[in-house]
Amino acid sequence: MEALHHAGGMVRVLHAQRGSQPEEMPLDTFMVRCEPYFGWGGCIIDQAFQPRLPEGMIRCYMSGKRVAGFGHQLIKALIPPPPEGPDSPEAQPGARIMHGPDAPSFQALRTLMENEWTPQMMKTLGIDEPSLPVIWDADFLYGPRDAAGADTYFLCEINASSCFAIPDEAPAAIARTVKIRLLREFESSSLAAAPERSKG
């Protein structure tokens, strides 16, 4: 949503749904249109528009608290359709290009996810490491570059039930996570059973 400063009380809106066209309407009309989002207890998040949206979205695939790979896709949502129209090939999103966790261009994001953002999320939500899904992902947009010219990132959403397709490296990461958790559970069970065996 963008306020039209030359027209009091008017806004320009663009739905993220494929094929949508920009619309101009009074703010009150827009709020009425959004009422269904609140009817079931939902909410609307005021997320600032990112001018670097045409550079694409980065999907960071996680297994537990470790990065399992990345996907980079040139998206078209929230970008006005080209002159060829919303159904033209030019208006369609690009393919998601998959990368392993060691991809050089995403190492800053990997460090943030593993060392800062995931631990902060776990602390805020009261989630321990074994409770994290063995495969989940977080989608990011590029934010403005910092003073040193490095990329910054803005979170779009977190997915825990619709993560596929996944990078080629991700199945091995999932297997490692499952193995570690099973071994920990086995060790815990063995330690708990040891006093019972000694009594016998």
Regions found by a protein language model. Give the residues of each.
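C-terminal active-site "lid" helix and adjoining low-complexity regulatory extension at the edge
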Residues: 126-137, 141-200
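Phosphate-binding site of ATP-dependent enzymes
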Residues: 2-128, 141-144, 151-154
